[in-house]
Amino acid sequence: MEVDKKFNNISIFNFNESWVNVEFDDPSSKNALSENMINELNNFLDQIERNDKIRGISFKGSNGMFCSGANLKEINEIFKASEPKDKAHKISTSIGKLLKRIQSLPQVTIMIVEGAAMAGGFGIMCAGDISIVHSKAKFSLTETMIGLTPAQISPYVIKKAGFANAKKLMITAE
């Protein structure tokens, strides 16, 4: 399949005039949600969310990895910043808005998961309408391992996995 539009961190493929495939394409970070990737996704969604001809969007990761969650290099830089609270709030809010936007799209969204869907990547999977998951795919709320709560993604995880399963995931990270 030929790339129709290549951004820095995502690639867009038109399957036909009514379906678009989005590929997270930053293998060096295991398709982490960088500020740049989030902006690219939002810019792309700006272009298609009101397009009546597009009936569906599939999301997948490149190189056998769906999405590893927030970009830890950027998170580390936030804590080194002079105003870390403001920067942390900005990235957290942008991830939250992206998840809400994916869930609210008028088009059908299908998440095709190979490899791992970690933290925010798992949240993106849960925000979609339908998930197609490879039998060897792995899921984890890795932020809980470092003492963070999965606050932005928890509504989507609870809706998709149910309260009891979501609670277990949020406590054990597995």
PLM features: what roles do these ranges have?
Residues 27-30, 64, 69, 116, ...:
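A short, glycine- and basic residue-enriched loop/turn
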Residues 30-31, 73-76, 140, 167:
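Nucleotide phosphate-binding site architecture
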Residues 59, 71, 124-126:
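Hydrophobic/aromatic residues within transmembrane alpha-helices
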Residues 61-97:
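Glycine- (often His-adjacent) and acidic-residue-rich active-site loop
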Residues 100-174:
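Crotonase-fold acyl-CoA enzyme core
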